Amino acid sequence: MNETLKEELLQSIREVKDYPKKGILFKDITTLLNYPKLFNKLIDALKKRYLALNIDFIVGIEARGFILGSALAYALGVGFVPVRKKGKLPAHTLSQSYSLEYGSDSIEIHSDAFRGVKGVRVVLIDDLLATGGTALASLELIKALQAECIEACFLIGLKELPGIQLLEERVKTFCLLEC
């Protein structure tokens, strides 16, 4: 990935102080989506990264992982599978809990997400990797469906939080921008 693209992406992402709570500097990728040529460059760069890896599906984490993941799946000509918050998928699901700062939450995937095929090759994608809780839970769901996660991909990885290190212990991890 070239440095010019990285700089353009950084410039296009809005930072919002004290959101969703005091002390957090939120990285808002919705502003990137206002620049179609830049968004196309991002998806083209990710397509180039994954094209030769024989990926069968892109798995996107709710909600901004849907934006990146569906565009990348389209570019690669592969299927897209959503990982959603508990209770949002209509058919039979598998569920995985994960810890939050205060309490826990759960995410789900349809039990037939990969058309019932075992051993499919997937890339997990989301906009941002912070603590790694949601991504690690997503990996468990992928594993439970007997799929192989080739790589976990994030537009942004927050270096000061443990997510990058925790995920790298389980799967190859790629963060386009490390902040």
Swiss-Prot record:
InterPro entries named in the record: Ade_phspho_trans, PRibTrfase_dom, PRTase-like, UPRTase/APRTase
GO CC, alphabetical: cytoplasm
Pathway, per record: Purine metabolism; AMP biosynthesis via salvage pathway; AMP from adenine: step 1/1
Subcellular location: Cytoplasm
GO biological process, one term: adenine salvage
Coiled coil: none
Catalysis performed (reactions): AMP + diphosphate = 5-phospho-alpha-D-ribose 1-diphosphate + adenine
An annotated Gene Ontology molecular function: adenine binding
Pfam families assigned: Pribosyltran
EC number(s) from the headed UniProt entry: 2.4.2.7
Keywords assigned by UniProt, alphabetized: Cytoplasm, Glycosyltransferase, Purine salvage, Transferase
Stored NCBIfam families: apt, PRK02304.1-3, PRK02304.1-5
Subunit structure: Homodimer.
Entries under HAMAP family matching the protein: Aden_phosphoribosyltr (MF_00004)
Known function: Catalyzes a salvage reaction resulting in the formation of AMP, that is energically less costly than de novo synthesis.
Family: Belongs to the purine/pyrimidine phosphoribosyltransferase family.
Name listed for the protein in its UniProt record: Adenine phosphoribosyltransferase
Source organism of this protein record: Helicobacter pylori (strain Shi470)
Encoding gene (name): apt
